[in-house]
Swiss-Prot record:
Organism from which the protein derives: Maricaulis maris (strain MCS10)
HAMAP family: SAICAR_synth
UniProt catalytic activity: 5-amino-1-(5-phospho-D-ribosyl)imidazole-4-carboxylate + L-aspartate + ATP = (2S)-2-[5-amino-1-(5-phospho-beta-D-ribosyl)imidazole-4-carboxamido]succinate + ADP + phosphate + 2 H(+)
Keywords: ATP-binding, Ligase, Nucleotide-binding, Purine biosynthesis
Protein name: Phosphoribosylaminoimidazole-succinocarboxamide synthase
Lineage: Bacteria, Pseudomonadati, Pseudomonadota, Alphaproteobacteria, Maricaulales
Pathway: Purine metabolism; IMP biosynthesis via de novo pathway; 5-amino-1-(5-phospho-D-ribosyl)imidazole-4-carboxamide from 5-amino-1-(5-phospho-D-ribosyl)imidazole-4-carboxylate: step 1/2
Annotated GO biological process: 'de novo' IMP biosynthetic process; cobalamin biosynthetic process
GO cellular component: cytosol
Amino acid sequence: MSRRKMIYEGKAKILYEGPEPGTIVQYFKDDATAFNNQKKATLEGKGVLNNRISEHIMLGLGRIGIPTHFLKRLNMREQLVRQVEIIPLEVVCRNVAAGSISTRLGVPEGDQLPRSIVEFYYKKDELGDPMISEEHITAFNWATHQEIDDMMAMTLRVNDFLCGLFTGAGIRLVDFKLEFGRHYEGDMVRTVLADEISPDSCRLWDLETNEKMDKDRFRRDMGNVTEAYAEVARRLGIMKESGQGAANGDVGKGDAAK
């Protein structure tokens, strides 16, 4: 059996050629990074959890009409996605002050923001993913005005969906990061949600205690990172109540790609 062709390896995922034209296999690694790759570790089972959580969320978003690259989960670590041309932006939606908005603007961490705030960042690790304006985006042709409008509208819809989903699970959605891509269908092109939505890309706090249940546990050396991710999965109904496995296998064993 011939090995699949690797297209790209990022910090948390590997992309392989898919079985059909226009498809990609997205493999979730156990690697954890922070501070633009300056801090690294391997957290056994993290990739499995992120795969399952992102699948659960992408399916929910698809049901309310938000176009995504997600097609189906293949196994515990992989999912089949549409091939898209990634727009080189990170779109961050903030509901509660935390992270860089607290340090930049002096807003105390944990303060509810006056309204949800959407920010754009240029996706460039070597530059530290700088925050940019819509003027920068259109001036450098990273995206069109229409694509910006589409990303803004979808981000706010995703925020509404996620707030409801996580509140129902006893979790406070502090903020999250999205990425988008261009999906070409013949002569048509549309903006779709890409990448993943997981505790790697969201700040999630327990609704009662404000305990962190996301990647900040790794950034701040708080420990129990995978356990926190597993608790998010359990509350979303993805894992068994015992916390020892997911619907189709044990998340704690770091299943290899099939």
